[in-house]
């Protein structure tokens, strides 16, 4: 799975807290769109905007932090 984010985003931090709590960071490729402009371009190509956090897996993309957190808990807890 890929997680598009940037460090100063409070919603991204909430997702990171869930990932840390579930001890599943090895399941992700983390893509900071402010550190690497190529990641921002990828995100725009995938979703037509730069809204983060954005979780991408084989089924598609998910953007709302609460939805991402619920998904992670339901699949990894």
Feature map (PLM): residue ranges:
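Local sequence-structure signature of Cys/Sec-based thiol-disulfide redox active-site neighborhoods
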Residues: 1-27
């Amino acid at each position: 799975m890929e997680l598009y984010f940037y460090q100063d985003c409070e919603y991204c931090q909430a997702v990171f807290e869930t990932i840390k709590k579930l001890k599943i960071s090895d399941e992700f490729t983390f893509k900071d769109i402010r550190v690497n402009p190529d990641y921002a371009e990828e995100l725009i190509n995938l979703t037509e905007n730069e809204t983060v956090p954005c979780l991408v897996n084989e089924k598609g993309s998910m953007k709302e932090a609460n939805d991402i957190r619920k998904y992670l808990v339901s699949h990894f807890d």
